[in-house]
Amino acid sequence: MNAKKLLKGSLMALMLPTILLSCSDNNNEPNESEMSAAKKAIIAQCVNNVVVPTYKSLADASMDLASVCADLKENPTQENVNKACKKWVEARKYWELSEAFLFGAASDYNIDPHIDSWPLQKSKLDQTLSNADLISELDTDGAGADGFSTLGYGLLGFHAVEYVIFRDGQPRNVSEI
């Protein structure tokens, strides 16, 4: 029994200095300014290589979608419906990618509910689309139309466009638009 106590005491005597010496204030961690510079570099890389290109692709695809939808309005053909559906899928893809980092203007100006509100207010959208006076005002004045501000989130954006050009996941028949 004495041998066990002696061995235990000896091990503790050897371990204690090791434990005490390993607890140093100098752990070679970078200082605040080094960490700040590293964080800034990481953020800049993410913004420049992910955020900006994704938002640019979203903007470009959305402009293409708007153009194709304008073509569809002027020349309602099945080919133009199909083109609009293809452009909608492309633009929607970039929106979905961008939701990972709603950053900058997307968060500052609360863009999400304007273009991605759910659920779609289907019955109200049907009423709106059948209101000839409102549609005429929107045609004439565009986004600056007084009636535009009364639409509300559930009648705007991707889901509203989807409702107009798709049915059951397929391009809608042009005769139904």
Regions of interest found by a model, annotated:
Residues 13-17:
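Alpha-helical transmembrane segments
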Residues 19-22:
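C-terminal motif of bacterial Sec signal peptides marking the signal peptidase cleavage site
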Residues 30-177:
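Mature extracytoplasmic or organellar-lumen-exposed domains after removal of signal/transit peptides
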Residues 2-11:
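Bacterial N-terminal signal peptides that target proteins for export
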Residues 24-27:
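Bacterial signal peptide processing site
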